[in-house]
UniProtKB/Swiss-Prot annotation:
It comes from Chlamydia pneumoniae (Chlamydophila pneumoniae). Belongs to the short-chain dehydrogenases/reductases (SDR) family. This is 3-oxoacyl-[acyl-carrier-protein] reductase FabG. Pfam families: adh_short_C2. Homotetramer.
Length: 248
């Protein structure tokens, strides 16, 4: 038994940058064929050009995961092409930070729709095919914010906490069909999402991390690879924290 993903067909939502891109790269290097879902087609095509030749086949589909119709259509197109889906990584996410008293309803709804409701759309679209195959791995990307909270992020924290609960519940529904559903909870990871934070806030975060550094997308991707592979074949309904010891 090893960590290879040769022959596996994979969808990674939000896979054109940050943690998602790190996961896509590592999966390709380990032999998987990966379709990236995102909104920015120009960025997606540039990413494909940079990743071609890494190992598996890579493609891009423009998908708004907050709309069920588009998700269903793209899952069907993926199945028409590959005839199966082995691994789904739900990584797409946005932030619309503000104190609750100043947060607009649109800021609340857009984060919940993209970060949480999208899992209902993607998972409900692929799960029947995984059930038929009696095989599959779903990896949902949450955040340590779900566990510790974050001022100014009630919408984001609520969505990420919902992902953890969703993961546990879906895992119990489909375990008998040999489908595993697990979750990642990254901490402070150097991505374009965290690059906008001011230096003082970054410094405070780093002081709280026992390992003394921010994480990288590759740090998270290696754990995702473990969950996608047969090395974790007896794991489901779990949330693996990747935060350098911040929430020990």
């Amino acid at each position: 038994m090893d960590i290879t993903l040769v022959g596996k067909k994979v969808i990674v939502t939000g896979g054109s940058r940050g943690i998602g891109l790190g996961i896509v790269k590592l999966f390709l290097e380990n032999g998987a064929d990966v379709e990236i879902w995102g909104l920015n087609e120009e960025r997606g095509q540039a990413v494909i050009e940079s990743l071609t030749g890494l190992g598996g086949e890579v493609s891009f589909a423009r998908v708004d995961v907050s709309h069920n119709g588009g998700v269903k259509d793209c899952v069907q197109k993926f199945l028409d092409k590959h005839n199966k889906i082995d691994i789904l990584v739900n990584n797409a996410g946005i932030t619309r930070d503000n104190l609750l008293m100043r947060m607009s309803e649109d800021d609340w709804q857009s984060v919940i729709s993209t970060n949480l409701t999208s899992l209902y759309y993607t998972c409900s679209s692929v799960i029947r095919h995984m059930i038929k195959a009696r095989s599959g791995s779903i990896i949902n990307v949450a955040s340590i914010v779900a566990k510790i909270g974050s001022a100014g992020q009630t919408n984001y924290a609520a969505a990420k906490a919902g992902i953890i609960a969703f993961t546990k519940s879906l895992a119990k529904e489909v375990a008998a069909r040999n489908i595993r559903v697990n979750c990642l909870a990254p901490g402070f990871i150097e991505t374009d999402m965290t690059s906008v934070l001011n230096d003082n806030l970054k410094a405070e975060w780093l002081k709280s991390i026992p390992l003394g550094r921010a994480g990288t997308p590759e740090d998270v991707a290696r754990v995702a690879l473990f969950l996608a592979s047969q090395l974790s074949s007896y794991m489901t309904a779990q949330t693996l924290v990747v935060d350098g010891g911040l929430t020990y």
